[in-house]
Amino acid sequence: MDMHARISQLFQASIETKQQAMEVILPHIVQASELMVQALLNEGKILSCGNGGSAGDAQHFSSELLNRFERERPSLPAIALTTDSSTLTSIANDYSYNEVFSKQIRALGQPGDVLLAISTSGNSANVIQAIQAAHDREMQVVALTGRDGGGMAALLLPEDIEIRIPAKVTARIQEVHLLVIHCLCDLIDNQLFGSEE
Ligand SMILES: O=C(CO)[C@@H](O)[C@H](O)[C@H](O)[C@H](O)COP(=O)(O)O
Ligand SMILES: [Zn+2]
């Protein structure tokens, strides 16, 4: 294997996936940022969840809101539902892994909060149940998906927003998800605290 050629292929595939996504998802990123800004202005918070690399994305997003993104500004309320190992293991052990996020949402979610639900396949059962719990708690959902949107896309309500990456490879979809998360942070900061060049 020519490793340099392989790396070039991976870079090229990532660039092309981002280019293709840019052609379709920009309006959805704008809408998602506006939805989150409205929630934050109304004293709501943003809960986030996902599995594996998407768990990392959920935490990445919440830490950028809670701590900081690129500028000094007040902390913004966000909770990643992927981090409390005692809660996660006890729910999985006593009930089911499919309920690890939904049970937390039923306890922490308030009407007007937003759920950022992340899955490259759109088919992770615990993320699907998280969306159902969010709807029961009168929360709107921003879904970061890929492929055909899976079961998540079918579950979304008209007031929810899906940002679907038009790609099939999990790693490439995740690479665009991270870019979308940084776009959301940038747009949220600019809408709440004024634009910065
Ligand atoms: O990061 C990766 C692959 O790039 C993996 O950890 C991946 O996130 C896991 O297999 C997830 O369980 C996949 O779940 P999903 O994206 O289909 O919801
Ligand atoms: Zn990954």
Curated annotation (Swiss-Prot):
Pathway: Carbohydrate biosynthesis; D-glycero-D-manno-heptose 7-phosphate biosynthesis; D-glycero-alpha-D-manno-heptose 7-phosphate and D-glycero-beta-D-manno-heptose 7-phosphate from sedoheptulose 7-phosphate: step 1/1
Pfam families noted in UniProt: SIS_2
The EC number(s) this enzyme carries: 5.3.1.28
UniProt enzyme class: isomerase
Cofactor dependency: Zn(2+)
GO molecular function: carbohydrate derivative binding; D-sedoheptulose 7-phosphate isomerase activity; zinc ion binding
Catalytic activity as recorded in UniProt: 2 D-sedoheptulose 7-phosphate = D-glycero-alpha-D-manno-heptose 7-phosphate + D-glycero-beta-D-manno-heptose 7-phosphate
UniProt: substrate binding residues: N51, G52, G53, E64, N93, D94, S119, T120, S121, S124, Q174
Keyword Zinc-finger: no
GO cellular component terms, semicolon-separated: cytoplasm
Classification via CDD domains: SIS_GmhA
Coiled-coil positions: none
Protein name: Phosphoheptose isomerase
Gene (name only): gmhA
